[in-house]
């Protein structure tokens, strides 16, 4: 009898514990901050005021789960690319920004598989644009993208891979 009560208690606790994870909702545990910063950065982004949008986007990225909105990750790639262009003369900072850009692409692939092919193709283009000074790393990245996208790989990515390998 005690074993049955114990088993029922454990099962009830397990169910209650797992329900908290799904109860967070689309915008995560701090949904008000998430929605607020999504709204703020989006307004600046629509106006192409990327300098003003970037700090608000960073806050949205901090408070929102990657699954809250696809545009948060895709807009983030545009904002980071803009920042990379402005910091061409600072190689250390540029390298960190490129790493952040690749992280955003990986999150897009992981959390939004519907858009994985286009995300991977865009990732390969940005790899080619920003990693030319690291040919081994570039070749490895391009090869990885081609292996994942297979027949849906953009033709120019094959050319980039060949030119990098030579």
Residue ranges and their predicted role:
Residues 27-28, 61, 106-109, 113, ...:
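A conserved position within tetratricopeptide repeats
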Residues 70, 119, 154-158:
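TPR alpha-solenoid repeat register
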Residues 56-59, 89-109, 134-149:
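Alpha-helical repeat scaffolds
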Residues 48, 131-133:
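Residue-level detector of the short coil/turn that links helix A to helix B
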Residues 21-99, 114-118:
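N-terminal leader/linker segments that initiate helical-solenoid repeat arrays
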Residues 133, 140, 151-166:
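Non-catalytic protein-protein interaction scaffold segments in large eukaryotic complex-forming proteins
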Residues 40, 76, 80-83, 123-127, ...:
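Structural register within alpha-helical repeat arrays
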Residues 1-30, 77:
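Bacterial Sec-dependent N-terminal signal peptides
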């Amino acid at each position: 009898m005690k074993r049955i009560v114990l088993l029922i208690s454990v099962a009830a606790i397990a169910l209650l514990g797992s329900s908290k994870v799904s109860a967070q909702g689309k915008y995560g545990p701090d949904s008000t901050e998430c929605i607020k910063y999504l709204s703020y950065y989006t307004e600046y982004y629509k106006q192409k005021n990327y300098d003003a949008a970037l700090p608000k986007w960073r806050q949205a990225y901090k408070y929102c789960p990657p699954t809250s909105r696809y545009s948060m990750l895709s807009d983030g790639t545009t904002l980071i690319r803009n920042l990379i262009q402005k910091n061409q003369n600072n190689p250390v900072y540029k390298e960190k920004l490129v790493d952040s850009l690749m992280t955003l692409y990986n999150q897009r692939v992981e959390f939004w598989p519907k858009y994985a092919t286009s995300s991977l193709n865009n990732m390969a283009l940005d790899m080619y644009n920003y990693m030319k000074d690291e040919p081994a790393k570039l070749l490895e990245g391009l090869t990885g993208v081609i292996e994942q996208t297979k027949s849906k790989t953009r033709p120019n990515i094959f050319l980039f891979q060949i030119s990098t390998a030579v």
